[in-house]
Design a protein with these regions (language model features):
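Conserved catalytic or regulatory cores that recognize and/or transform ribose-phosphate-containing ligands
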Residues: 1-107
Length: 107
């Protein structure tokens, strides 16, 4: 069974976050992983949803995963730090995205 990876990266205040998340997802899927991309899950909630509403959905998605993959800039994000804390509590494997992209062009 393929490992399921959760992408953790800053979204709030990052204008091109969809491009960043989608590019990372493509690289990881191409490497044979199942990827949970929270940036693509915004359709689950309506336009009036709060940051906390999104975090609840994100945390549920994280619970379904085996590995937390941290995108550049994660450490500056409150939401990413919450995801990191949950991953630590659950003894999940935690990896930096750059581990997957060493030697890969345009990753």
């Amino acid at each position: 069974m393929k490992q399921r990876l959760y992408l953790s990266g800053p979204i709030t205040g990052v204008p091109n976050y969809m491009d960043i998340f989608n590019r990372a997802e493509a690289v990881l899927v191409g490497a044979g992983y199942q990827v949970v991309n929270p940036a693509n899950m915004c359709y689950v909630l309506n336009s009036e949803a709060s940051h906390e509403d999104y975090m609840r959905v994100d945390m549920e998605m994280l619970r379904m995963c085996d590995v937390l993959v941290q995108l550049p800039g994660w450490e500056k994000s409150i939401g990413c730090n919450r995801e990191y804390g949950m991953a630590l509590e659950r003894d999940m494997v935690i990896l930096e995205y750059t581990k997957f992209t060493e030697g890969v062009k345009n990753a």
